[in-house]
Amino acid sequence: MARGNQRELARQKNMKKSQEISKGKRKEDSLTTSQRKQRDSEIMQQKQKAANERKSMQTREK
């Protein structure tokens, strides 16, 4: 039974560690939800534009 307890303690320790890491990432960001959405939408638009350019270059080559 000791192993079951050991596994449980290790699981709790890992969960606590991962929560601290995720909290740290959010604090570094320090953006509001709307600012984060705006930033993410700009990034996605840039990616989409680059993908469209690559696609148009491939169709021109054919």
Swiss-Prot record:
Cross-referenced Pfam families: SERF-like_N (PF04419)
Main subcellular location: cytoplasm
Gene Ontology cellular component list: cytosol; nucleus
Localization in the cell: Cytoplasm, Cytosol; Nucleus
Basic and acidic residues biased stretches: 1-30, 50-62
Disordered: annotated segments: 1-62
Alphabetic keyword roster: Cytoplasm, Nucleus
Described function: Positive regulator of amyloid protein aggregation and proteotoxicity. Induces conformational changes in amyloid proteins, such as APP, HTT, and SNCA, driving them into compact formations preceding the formation of aggregates.
Family: Belongs to the SERF family.
Subunit field text: Interacts with SNCA; this interaction promotes the aggregation of SNCA.
Annotated protein name in UniProt: Small EDRK-rich factor 1
Organism: Bos taurus
GN (gene name): SERF1
